[in-house]
Design a protein with these regions (language model features):
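Sec-dependent signal peptide cleavage junction
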Residues: 1-2, 187
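C-terminal partner/receptor-binding element of secreted or periplasmic proteins
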Residues: 153-187
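Aromatic-patch recognition
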Residues: 2-157
Length: 187
């Protein structure tokens, strides 16, 4: 455990050379001239001890592997710092920010976006899957039927209600996963 003051954070910066959500600098005092650099590979978590109105319990960032499939390896992961969003008995959701490129007319511009992901508590690798990857073949080996269950979650009359709730609740994936586990237990 290291206590200190954050001098340069890990958040996604506009610099194209710095890895997003990966490294940060911590100083022993606010005036310290020699901060120490840490990376997501070296830390387990970061906990803010100063509480704010929006986060009365402080904010916890964890260093975890994020699923990032590629052409050569569909199970590739990157170690990054992700913010704990909400935890349940069976899974935990996280968020982090990334830079993406959007086309506006004839101009490409960089946009900062928030990505949400889920870590299943029974996953031995502790991998965080971005929401958009949960309904792919990546989770099928460990959670048979989850891919199909996820694709039908927003279908039908109940699905329309769930879709409306999902826009207001960014941790909707926890409810979907609990429903999937309940359906598996009934089989």
């Amino acid at each position: 455990k290291v206590d200190g003051y954050l001098q340069r954070s890990w958040h996604a910066e506009s610099s194209v050379l710095k890895k997003e959500n990966y490294s940060f600098k911590l100083a022993k005092t606010p005036d310290d001239k020699e901060p120490v650099k840490y990376t997501a590979d070296e830390v387990e978590s970061i906990e803010y001890v100063e509480k704010t109105e929006a986060h009365p319990d402080g904010i916890r960032w964890e260093a975890l592997d994020i699923a990032s499939p590629g052409l050569k390896d569909r199970y590739r992961t990157f170690r990054r710092l992700v913010c704990l969003n909400k935890a349940s008995q069976n899974a935990t959701t996280y968020w982090w920010k990334i830079w993406t490129t959007e086309r506006v007319g004839n101009i490409d511009r960089r946009v900062l976006k928030t990505v949400y992901g889920i870590r299943f508590h029974d996953d031995p690798d502790r991998t965080v899957y971005p929401y958009m990857l949960v309904n792919t073949m990546l989770v099928e080996k460990q959670h048979p039927g989850l891919q199909k269950f996820c694709k039908t979650w927003f279908k039908g009359s109940e699905g329309k209600v769930r879709k409306k709730e999902a826009k207001e609740n960014d941790a909707w994936m926890l409810d979907m996963y609990d429903a999937y586990l309940a359906a598996q237990a009934d089989k």
